[in-house]
A protein has these predicted regions:
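N-terminal secretory targeting modules
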Residues: 1-168
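Catalytic nucleophile-elbow at a beta strand-turn-alpha helix junction centered on a G-D-S/GDSL motif
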Residues: 166-190
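Short helix-loop-beta junction
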Residues: 190-202
Length: 203
């Protein structure tokens, strides 16, 4: 069921089924956009805990036939990096593929006013209603409080199809592994490999 509506769209909380969040190892248990357990603060440094609040590698998967998809976001803070794009630090980007296709296609990213901590923007638009697999990448260097997706009121929504490869690939590394300084989230190398190999990566 949708969380709320306006004149055009039903908005859905992506933490709830049928949406599937991948890339965040503790999400299924804690329902937080966080890369470590929330109660690990006493076991790691302040810097590590802060970086864990950035959901780099987080991916949202689902199927829909909506002609338009709107994303509504509440961030932990505004984008502020001088060496990285605002969309790479604090934005989302969307990929799609048709049911008979193997590879994802990039559509667009959230090019919003980067001083804002809340925004709503059209992330996908199509002239005709057709079923597609959708993949949305999370920000690389910014905490995320809440995300809702707006779909057309007559659109249908289904769980993501199973990946060809089961299991997970865990990657540990430097700021480059987290995604610095990719221009947008989908260009972080772990996200590229996840799409190409069709397997979940834990960043």
């Amino acid at each position: 069921a949708c969380s709320f509506s306006d004149e055009t769209y039903h908005y859905y909380d992506i933490k709830k089924a049928p949406f599937k969040i991948e890339g965040l190892a503790w999400f299924s248990k804690e329902k937080e956009y966080f890369r470590l357990p929330k109660d690990c603060q006493q076991d790691v440094s302040e810097a590590v805990y802060w970086l864990a609040s950035h959901p780099a590698g987080g991916q949202l998967h689902f199927q829909s036939n909506s002609k338009t998809i709107v994303i509504k976001v509440q961030l932990a803070a505004s984008a502020n990096m001088t060496h990285m794009t605002g969309v790479g630090q604090a934005g989302f980007d969307l990929y799609y593929k048709k049911r008979n296709e193997k590879n994802y296609h990039f559509f667009t990213s959230t090019n919003y006013p980067y001083g804002q901590v809340e925004y709503s923007i059209v992330l996908y638009r199509n002239d005709k209603k057709e079923w597609k697999d959708f993949l949305i990448h999370f920000p690389l260097y910014m905490g995320v409080k809440n995300v809702w997706l707006g779909l057309e009121k007559d659109a249908l929504l289904k769980p993501a199809r199973k990946r060809k490869k089961q299991g997970k690939v865990v990657v540990y590394g430097t700021s480059i592994t987290q995604g610095g300084c990719a221009t947008r989230p989908g260009m972080a190398y772990t996200n590229i490999l996840s799409r190409q190999l069709d397997i979940e990566f834990i960043n």
